[in-house]
Design a protein with these regions (language model features):
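Conserved serine/cysteine hydrolase catalytic core
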Residues: 1-66, 72-73
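Catalytic active-site module of serine/aspartate enzymes centered on a nucleophile-bearing elbow/loop
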Residues: 69-98
Length: 98
């Protein structure tokens, strides 16, 4: 997997950790500042049926609180959608962007 190659680089690991750190700090502050605003553009939400998102969240309902027009579904895969379900992902993207 390409992820293994990239994660051999300490800078990549550092950047990944910084992304998670931001999610529980500055991202929360930004979310709070935007609490009364909704994304006006149509939003496509895709997630893996066999991943954490499916088990722990309600993606369409959750995003409907933050966006005016939400579409999407679980794809027949796990966490790594492009690698696990490329054809299904492409079909969804082409349909959404057409």
């Amino acid at each position: 997997m390409e992820y293994r190659r990239c994660f051999r680089d300490p800078a990549a690991i550092h950047a990944s950790c910084e992304d998670y750190r931001a999610a529980e700090s500055i991202d929360l502050a930004h979310d709070e500042a935007d609490i009364d605003r909704k994304v006006a553009a149509p939003l496509l939400v895709l997630w893996g049926k066999y991943g954490t998102v499916e088990r722990c969240f309600h993606p369409l309902a959750d995003w409907a609180e933050r966006a005016e027009s939400v579409h999407g579904r679980a794809l027949d895969c796990g966490h790594y959608i492009p690698e696990e379900a490329p054809a299904e992902l492409l079909k969804e993207l082409v349909t959404f962007l057409s």
